[in-house]
Amino acid sequence: MTQGPGGRAAPEPEAPTTFCALLPRMPQWKFAAPGSFLGRGPAATRVAGVAEAQPEPGVPALAAVLGACEPRCAAPCPLPALGRCRGSGTRGARVTPDVADEWVRKGGFIHKPAHGWLHPDARVLGPGVSYIVRYMGCIEVLRSMRSLDFNTRTQVTREAINRLHEAVPGVRGSWKKKAPNKALASILGKSNLRFAGMSISVNISVDGLNLSVPATRQIIANHHMQSISFASGGDTDMTDYVAYVAKDPINQRACHILECCEGLAQSVISTVGQAFELRFKQYLHSPPKAVVPPERLTGLEELAWGDDDAAADHNYYNSIPGKEPPLGGLVDSRLAVTQPCALATLGGLGQGMTPVWRDARGLPWDMGPSGAAPPGDGYVQADARGPHDYEEHLYVNTQGLDAVELEDTAEAPLQFEDSPKKDLFDMRPFEDALKLHACSVAAGITAASPPLEDQWPSPPTRRAPIAPTEEQLRQEPWYHGRMSRRAAEKLLRADGDFLVRDSVTNPGQYVLTGMHAGQPKHLLLVDPEGVVRTKDVLFESISHLIDYHLKNGLPIVAAESELHLRGVVSREP
């Protein structure tokens, strides 16, 4: 230590410290900047004053507010002042236990600039600090930055700059062209050059980084602070560039490159560091509350497959003394409940009107004065949708059913409440009636004509579904009657073992349970139309389906998987 002219000890020169050393306890958040951060000295204030300067008369408001070192700005960066600020360096600080505790308790950086941050905390906590930079595009990052060491992360950002520097025309930043790094070919993916080469505004605050077009205020990207995993800028070999890796819904995980005028990159990366420190302090003051998972989530197997007998654990209103039943009574699971606003509209039309509920096809169902829908009988009917199977998402051969239902919903027109009680889901009589009615009006037919419903053609005959009976299935050794999913899986020992059971949650729905590649599979055997079928073949009955695949040694193919039937799991006598 040497005494200065004013009796004050002059600081000892130290080697530059990378920004990553400031975050020893946050491995997923690292910054790289070998020079020191700009302090709040007079020189540094003049450099960064563009973000805090008051608008002068005659100077465009945009340049005064966003003030940065884009060549079109009114005042360029004072390079001598920037050099003095860089030369001043950051006062060294040893990592002692007290300083480490300071980071944990208050969220302060260990190697914080001696003169403080570049901007007031209130500015970063509030509207943020804006800079005018040139956006160079982004490159997809295929691997998580947490899985890479710090040197590899730095190489990723430099390789991204190296690729975009050649692809984007009109770049002015200082960059030495390097040979492509083949070792990073598996980490970096495709590039996105949309908005590349445009002058944009980057706003930095505790909320994150917001990239927008200054003239039109169009948002290019908005990266929250917690989505940014790495930032680097202002190094000796990338003095004019800032690179950061963040995730967003458009580009997924990508490395975004910003080109700054000379000296501005250090200001940008310093402001990002300040925003991160303030955000971390906010986290320390109000950490998120621990969420206790429900007991049902304790077992992954239970979550994945569900429990058919879970309904027995619920407390129903008719088993609790004094408990009133819910309003509305039983609601058929085939009916889609309308929005409350729809019922309010009906109520406004007349106080004496009966609520009408419509199913997925838009057909009316009279609920009656009590609002109770007719309960389903639990079996699949010929011309109506069967009750919703709550295990449907757990089966491997039901992926195409939702698409068929959506098609039918989109194509089926709306019927009126006074429609004849014919085939409800046959739309052709309704269409024919509309055509006949239009012709009648055009021809001037009077009310003496026969009733309209008598002129409707009869619905076409449709093949009745094959509904297997309990007596027929009881004759087969592989049929076990009503059985839960878990109980059926316990009976399977080897690949090819199979049985057929009646669903517990949806009586009348028959399920084939078998073992394939050590995993149990569950296939629905009767489709919503009541037909026994596989993906490509229709069968006369469940027994026909089982015998066909068992005798011919053919697998049942469903949802890109197959199930072989080799060993019959016989039911207990």
From Swiss-Prot:
GO terms for biological process: intracellular signal transduction. Signaling adapter that couples activated growth factor receptors to signaling pathway in neurons. Involved in the signal transduction pathways of neurotrophin-activated Trk receptors in cortical neurons. Interacts with the Trk receptors in a phosphotyrosine-dependent manner and MEGF12. Once activated, binds to GRB2. Keywords: Phosphoprotein, SH2 domain. The modification Phosphotyrosine is found at residues 316-317, 395. This is SHC-transforming protein 2. Residues 478-569 form the SH2 domain. Residues 125-309 form the PID domain. Expressed in brain. Expressed at high level in the hypothalamus and at low level in the caudate nucleus. Residues 310-477 are annotated as: CH1. The keyword S-adenosyl-L-methionine does not apply. The keyword Secreted does not apply. It comes from the Eukaryota. The PID domain mediates binding to the TrkA receptor. PANTHER family: SHC TRANSFORMING PROTEIN (PTHR10337), SHC-TRANSFORMING PROTEIN 2 (PTHR10337:SF5). Phosphorylated on tyrosine by the Trk receptors.
